[in-house]
Structure formats: structure tokens, C-alpha cells
Swiss-Prot record:
Entry keyword annotation includes Acyltransferase: yes
Name listed for the protein in its UniProt record: Mycothiol acetyltransferase
Complexes and interactors: Monomer.
Family as reported in the entry's similarity comment: Belongs to the acetyltransferase family. MshD subfamily.
Keyword Transferase: yes
Residues reported in the UniProt entry to bind acetyl-CoA 2: 281-283, 288-294
Function per UniProt: Catalyzes the transfer of acetyl from acetyl-CoA to desacetylmycothiol (Cys-GlcN-Ins) to form mycothiol.
Organism per entry: Corynebacterium jeikeium (strain K411)
Keywords attached to this entry: Acyltransferase, Repeat, Transferase
Length: 345
């Protein structure tokens, strides 16, 4: 039976196709040992995020899917049983011929398998970005877990000695208010990630959309605050007086945060068997060089341990040598590499 290729600008509205797409994505992840589609692109499949899609159909069964976002970044998956049958190439041809996409494109290869490398070579693509997945095993009562607990306690002490206050997102909103806290969150995020293609340039609406997931836990976001007594006319932060503080010259500034993640399916596992993630670690420019980046990382890891995680994972840019070095000191090892290849249609 010939494989056909259908295009969608509203895939999320086609429930019968969505079911087949998710089935093939599950099969690909099981066979390859790594998901072919990232969290952001999964959301682009299930809801309107401006993504377009090409779906390969082998009769009534989904045989592959290609997704492209508004920035011309592409992710795709091909069912194991139809690999080496030009399905991947045909998905790109349909993207060009049916959706009219041509010119430069960036293609993610999650896991960067030998098959993926051969495929992108056929597109005359070059390697432009590496994203490392690192992990550390830390079951309860093991040496690694005890070291993390001790590191977290030391981090709490280090923050207190420098007059920084660690509050969860829940506690921060109770102390101040949601709009002010979210504004500070976005300010610090964009300052730290001005260079980042996905993490930078956020606004409050985008932040709230990013938090709108089944796994988000406001107590899993640790925020580092400092009381600023600087009397300069132009300052950022949250005025103390507006929130029950004393005086009009003080503000609380956010200087960093650690957004941790425990997927919903992991929360259903027994304590000690869950996998958590160092999801986003962020530090203000003027707070660097004081050991706070490692401290807030350790605080989040301690929180993940306390919430039953026996393994912790993270993703980091391959060319971010200081961060990779820090994570290795904390016991993390590289387990696989995701790669972006740049080519042309």
C-alpha cells in the first residue's frame, strides 16, 4: 500500500489523527530509547502554537510526522517499520511542495543516532548546536543522595550568609503578589537567556502558558530574593511598602530561580524511584561570581530528593563549558546528545 502525506495547519483539531500520531511517537521512543519530539513540539501538536505538520499515512495507520514551528525549526519521527523507505525524505518534500516551505531550516536530531546522521547528510545539512542530556542516580540513602543533601544544606547556609532569602513560588506570591512575582521571573529569565533561541524573549503571558502543564508544581520553583536598600531613582523589583514592608526606599529583587520538574507519570511511582529534572536554572547578571549558581542548583536538587526522586536529569547547551563543568562536579554525566542540523529545502 502506498504511503500518502497529509498536511495540517490545525492538527490539534483532528482527534483521530492525533491519536495515531501519539501512538507512533510512543513506539519511536520505545525503540530508539529517546523521544523524537520535544515537549515544546508535543504542545504544538496538541494545541495551537503556530506549528504546521505533515503526517505520513500507511493506510489507516500513521507512519510518520514532521512538525515545523514559526521559527522554521523542525522535529520529526518515522515509524520503525517504514524506516529506510524514504518516508523521512518524503515528509520534507511534502513540507516544501504542499506547505510551500523553502530555504533555510533547522532540524533537531534527538539522540543524534547514526540513522539520523545519515538522513541529515542527505539534506546537505551541517551541525550547528548540541544539547547535552546529563543525569545522576541518587536513590535514597546512597552516597550520591547523602552528598546532595549535604550540598543542599551548605547552599542554604551560603545564601543566608549573603542575606538572600529562598522562597518557593507559592511563598513568593503569598509574600508579594502573582503579577509582581511573574514580572520579576520574566525579567531575570530574559536577562540570563538573552542569547537563547527558546528560553529568551519571554513575556508574562508566555511564562504562564509554559506553566500550564499537568506537571507544574509552584512549590517546585525556588526563587532567590534579596532586599535592596539602594536609593537609586530607577530600580527594578517589588516595593516593600506595597507588600507590608517598612519604608518606600526598599525593594525585593529576584536574583535567581530554579524551576524543577517531576513529570506526572513519575509522581505516580514510589518515592525513591522517580526521575526529576533540573528544568531551568537562572541567575541575574549582577549576582554572578558569588557561588549562587551552584547554590541554587543544589537547592533544587535537594528539593527533588525530598520529593522522592532517585534520579535527576537536566539539559544543557554543549558549548556552555562552565555549566557542564559545574554539573559534572555535582555528579552528572552525559547520557546522550541532541543536535540541531541546518540545511535548505
Amino acid at each position: 500500500m502506498a504511503i500518502t502525506y497529509d498536511t495540517y495547519e490545525d492538527l490539534w483539531e483532528h482527534s483521530e489523527v492525533l491519536e495515531g500520531v501519539h501512538e507512533v511517537l510512543s513506539e519511536v521512543a520505545e525503540v530508539d530509547g529517546v523521544p523524537a519530539i520535544s515537549e515544546a513540539f508535543l504542545r504544538g501538536i496538541d494545541e495551537d502554537r503556530g506549528h504546521k505538520h505533515v503526517v505520513a499515512m500507511n493506510g489507516d495507520r500513521v507512519a510518520g510526522v514532521l512538525a515545523i514551528d514559526p521559527d522554521r525549526v523542525i522535529e520529526l519521527a518515522v515509524a520503525p517499520e517504514v524506516r529506510h523507505s524514504r518516508v523521512g525524505i518524503a515528509l520534507f518534500e511534502a513540507l516544501r511542495d504542499q506547505l510551500g516551505v523553502s530555504g533555510g531550516i533547522d532540524v533537531w536530531a534527538h539522540g543524534d543516532s547514526a540513522g539520523a546522521q545519515r538522513f541529515v547528510e542527505s539534506l546537505d545539512a551541517r551541525r550547528t548546536r548540541e544539547l547535552l542530556k546529563m543525569s545522576v542516580d541518587c536513590p535514597p540513602a546512597t552516597k550520591a543522595a547523602k552528598a546532595m543533601e549535604a550540598g543542599g544544606a551548605e547552599a542554604e547556609k551560603r545564601c543566608a550568609e549573603q542575606d538572600f532569602e529562598v522562597l518557593s513560588y507559592t511563598e513568593s506570591v503569598a509574600r508579594f503578589d502573582a503579577d509582581s512575582v511573574d514580572a520579576e521571573w520574566v525579567r531575570i529569565n530574559n536577562e540570563a537567556f538573552a542569547w537563547h533561541p527558546e528560553q529568551g524573549g519571554w513575556d508574562v503571558d508566555y511564562l504562564r502558558s509554559a506553566r500550564d502543564t499537568n506537571w507544574f508544581d509552584p512549590d517546585g520553583v525556588l526563587m532567590l530574593w534579596v532586599r535592596d536598600e539602594n536609593s537609586a531613582a530607577e530600580r527594578v523589583g517589588i516595593p516593600c511598602a506595597a507588600n507590608g514592608g517598612e519604608g518606600n526606599d526598599d525593594v525585593f529583587r529576584l536574583v535567581g530561580f530554579h524551576w524543577t520538574k517531576i513529570p506526572l507519570e513519575e509522581k505516580e511511582k514510589d518515592a525513591g524511584e522517580r526521575t526529576g529534572e533540573v528544568y531551568v536554572v537562572c541567575l541575574a547578571d549582577d549576582a554572578r561570581g558569588r557561588g549562587l549558581g551552584q547554590a541554587i542548583t543544589q537547592l533544587g536538587m535537594k528539593s527533588l530528593l525530598e520529593n522522592g526522586c532517585g534520579r535527576i536529569e537536566l539539559y544543557v547547551e554543549g558549548d556552555n563549558a562552565p555549566a557542564v563543568s559545574t554539573y559534572k562536579r555535582l555528579g552528572f554525566e552525559v547520557v546522550h546528545t541532541d543536535v540541531v542540523y541546518r540545511g535548505r529545502l
